[in-house]
Amino acid sequence: RKLKEREEKTGQKMPKAVLLFTVCLHHFLGCDLERIYRELEQRFPEIRFLRCYMDPIMQKHGPTPDQKLRKAMYEPLNPDRNKMDTKQISILGSDFALDLSCDLKELLAIAGYKVRELQDCSTWEEYEELGNAGTFLCCYPSGKYGIETLAERLRRAFLYLPLSFDYEEIRSEEETLWNSLGVEGKQILSEWMEKKIALCEEALNHAKQIIGNAPITIDYTFHPRPLGLARLLLIHGFNVKTVFLDSISPEEKEVFEWLKVNAPKLELRATVHAKMRVLHEAHPSEKTLAIGQKAAWSTGSHYFVNLVQGASLQGFDGIRRTAELMEEAFLNEKDPKTMIVRKGWGCTSCI
């Protein structure tokens, strides 16, 4: 009713899709959600109602609300098979578009592939074009479940190349990509990767000269591989003191074991602990570089990298950019209380 009233009053057309979130209360009350969705679809056949969930009571098993949301976002994709473009790759599953300078986009451009991302879409028609890709690629762990499901449903190729700070893992992922594209010239790829690694080493060494032995803290909101970043920095001589995280990702178990042996004094702190609310009141006695918002808030540091979820960083280029961001953060003071409280991009409500 409100949708129709808005259309009559403002002339604003009905949305093509609505992300409808149900919460814990609906489950407690035993709501017949399927009937609700069925009724909505009958009343508004021109609108796709996407089944989204904000039900943390269900997080003990099965996909998380975040994983289910990233799956729901692509359920309307059901393109005409005649339009499938084998030279198009859709990179999906993350909240951020990858940098133009990232490894994936550079390699795909060399191979003559067209890249599409959700963040580039400004119309429904552009969104639908995402489904015409011959291959779906995901880099973000929480997006893997949804994008793999999408690829299976549309019977397309799927590649999971997770974000990483490990040279050998990145090398393996990019060889996998290169081979899947059927591009000749492995020597070209090898030489290209060596140049990228050299740029990483140069950036890390320069950052070390600037940051010196200043203590560094990292948190899991900065990147899905916080322990991998800690290992990379420790190997390059940085003074990493603490990693804030609430669990060890299966993708980081090998790194965790390495840190236990090679960095036994490294602290791992849970962010869900009640005392973390006031930990920032004990300001650091020395200049501390915080990598991530929770690390900045928890340490009270005014020198922090203000970035979440790995953002647009990927591959060897992502390592280089991380070193540059660390250097920039260490040289420029920011107030965490005025920056970190800003959450979300904002979204138009259908009601």
Name these PLM-found stretches.
Residues R1-I351:
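An N-terminal assembly and electron-transfer interface module characteristic of large anaerobic redox
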